[in-house]
Curated annotation (Swiss-Prot):
<dbReference type="InterPro" id="IPR022941">
    <property type="entry name" value="SRP54"/>
</dbReference>
<dbReference type="Pfam" id="PF00448">
    <property type="entry name" value="SRP54"/>
</dbReference>
<dbReference type="InterPro" id="IPR004780">
    <property type="entry name" value="SRP"/>
</dbReference>
<dbReference type="InterPro" id="IPR013822">
    <property type="entry name" value="Signal_recog_particl_SRP54_hlx"/>
</dbReference>
<feature type="binding site">
    <location>
        <begin position="245"/>
        <end position="248"/>
    </location>
    <ligand>
        <name>GTP</name>
    </ligand>
</feature>
<dbReference type="GO" id="GO:0003924">
    <property type="term" value="F:GTPase activity"/>
</dbReference>
<dbReference type="GO" id="GO:0005525">
    <property type="term" value="F:GTP binding"/>
</dbReference>
<keyword id="KW-0963">Cytoplasm</keyword>
<keyword id="KW-0547">Nucleotide-binding</keyword>
<feature type="binding site">
    <location>
        <begin position="105"/>
        <end position="112"/>
    </location>
    <ligand>
        <name>GTP</name>
    </ligand>
</feature>
<dbReference type="GO" id="GO:0006614">
    <property type="term" value="P:SRP-dependent cotranslational protein targeting to membrane"/>
</dbReference>
<dbReference type="InterPro" id="IPR027417">
    <property type="entry name" value="P-loop_NTPase"/>
</dbReference>
<comment type="subunit">
    <text>Part of the signal recognition particle protein translocation system, which is composed of SRP and FtsY.</text>
</comment>
<keyword id="KW-0342">GTP-binding</keyword>
<keyword id="KW-0694">RNA-binding</keyword>
<comment type="function">
    <text>Involved in targeting and insertion of nascent membrane proteins into the cytoplasmic membrane. Binds to the hydrophobic signal sequence of the ribosome-nascent chain (RNC) as it emerges from the ribosomes. The SRP-RNC complex is then targeted to the cytoplasmic membrane where it interacts with the SRP receptor FtsY.</text>
</comment>
<dbReference type="Pfam" id="PF02978">
    <property type="entry name" value="SRP_SPB"/>
</dbReference>
Length: 430
């Protein structure tokens, strides 16, 4: 997500790079480009107008017209405005000894999947979640949550057709007490569109169960429609926080930039993949940095630590072998798709595609070598390279290009040797 917006904002700011002082007309032109980029990304009109006005006022306050580095001033100002539009500081629901949360939203928003993802997330934090399939009209919705609960290893309480809120409350309380469950996640009824029966059912269930949080799940790919949904749910039911799903999609991102402003509610979580673990706390400052090409090294460092890679000592360029290269490649695969990882690095465009098949071919080349060949590529004569190409399903030319690239990489590493980190993993060692 945000590839188009990211490219447009970086292009608008980039036009000021390398220039000395700029004129007021230059600033106006840059702000016009920023406004167009926001509107094309389906950002709410009021949000876009307020955003540009804030950037203009703060840039002038920082005397951008007198600055010798106007691009840096505008970049910093846009970053702060983006961060605030997305919610400012990161926030999560406050946990108590016992917690009961509602998940509300339309069908297709990812609400039921999000319930299971939340259960898995908090299970990993030491909580004992219980999922409640509370759609009294659609047995298929209850079955979906039951299957997801089995997948993430969390029990599911299914309501019965037409069951009253009072009965649901009694059964939920009893099961939570008997099994010592301290986080109850209620997947409420979903509909294809907002209607009075749906809202009435939700309001009645809320009145009886008394949830601590009401989390509205919004599909970030639905654009301005998501904002209408958010307003309706907040007015009729009362929303305490938002979860944005499908942030890994190709949508323009307007909902993410507008939802907090329109509802006044914090964005707690973001769905970043379809996998059960594909739910992350929402960090406004990190997303703002990614959009502006500033990277998100904090998220990358977390992935490295979660994969247990930070304790592995990096080797010097002189010691680095193809065996080490293979190990690093396999380590990076544990962090996630290469395109996703590269997108977290400063200066790498959002949406950059990496040929994963080509990566697998490189891995196959190294795996087709003997331990001696991986240790010392200098012994790779013509016949050895031919054997490796055959064993890896590649060509001799591909093997030759790979060996040459590896040697060039070692030469580059030698020139960086005096810097603190060695290689990607070295960036995150404490």
């Amino acid at each position: 997500m945000f590839q188009q917006l990211s490219a447009r904002l970086q292009e608008a700011i980039g036009r000021l790079r390398g220039r000395g002082r700029i004129t007021e007309e230059d600033l106006k032109a840059t702000l016009r480009e920023i406004r167009r980029a926001l509107m094309d990304a389906d950002v709410n009109l009021e949000v876009a107008r307020d955003f540009v006005e804030r950037v203009r006022e703060e840039a002038l306050g920082k005397q951008v017209l007198e600055s010798l580095t106007p691009a840096e001033v505008i970049l910093a100002t846009v970053y702060e405005a983006l961060k605030e539009a997305l919610g400012g500081e990161a926030r999560l629901p406050v946990l108590k000894d016992r917690n009961l949360w509602f998940l509300v939203g339309l069908q297709g928003s990812g609400k039921t999947t999000t319930a299971a993802k939340l259960a898995l997330y908090y299970k990993g934090k030491g909580r004992r979640p219980l999922l409640v399939a509370a759609d009294t009209q659609r047995p298929a919705a209850r079955e979906q949550l039951r299957l997801l609960g089995e997948k993430v290893g969390v029990p599911v309480l299914e309501v019965m057709d037409g069951e009253s809120p009072e009965s649901i409350r009694r059964r939920v309380e009893e099961k939570a007490r008997l099994e010592a469950r301290d986080l109850i996640l209620v997947d409420t009824a979903g509909r294809l569109q907002i209607d009075e029966p749906l809202m009435g059912e939700l309001a009645r269930l809320k009145e009886v169960l008394g949830p601590d949080e009401v989390l509205l799940v919004l599909d970030a790919m639905t654009g301005q429609e998501a904002l209408s949904v958010a307003r309706a749910f907040d007015e009729k039911v009362g929303v305490t926080g938002l979860v944005l799903t499908k942030l890994d999609g190709d949508a323009r991102g307007g909902a993410a930039l507008s939802a907090r402003h329109v509802t006044g509610k914090p964005i707690y979580f973001a769905g970043v993949s379809e996998k059960p673990e594909g739910l992350e706390p929402f960090y406004p400052e990190r997303l703002a940095g990614r959009i502006l090409g500033m990277g998100d090294v904090a998220s990358l460092a977390e992935k490295v630590r979660a994969a247990g890679l930070e304790a592995e000592a990096p080797k010097s360029a002189k010691e680095l072998s193809l065996e080490d290269f293979l190990k690093q490649m396999q380590n990076l695969k544990r962090l996630g798709p290469f395109s996703e990882i590269l997108g977290l690095l400063p200066g790498v465009p959002q949406g950059l595609k990496v040929d994963e098949k080509a990566i697998k071919r490189l891995e196959a080349i190294v795996l087709s070598m003997t331990p001696e060949e991986r240790k010392d590529p200098r012994i790779l004569n013509g016949s050895r390279r031919k054997r490796i190409a055959k064993g890896s399903g590649t060509s001799v030319q591909e093997v030759n290009r790979f060996i040459k690239a590896f040697e060039e990489m070692k030469a580059l590493m030698k020139s960086l040797e005096k810097k603190k980190g060695r290689g990607l993993m070295g960036m995150f060692r404490r």
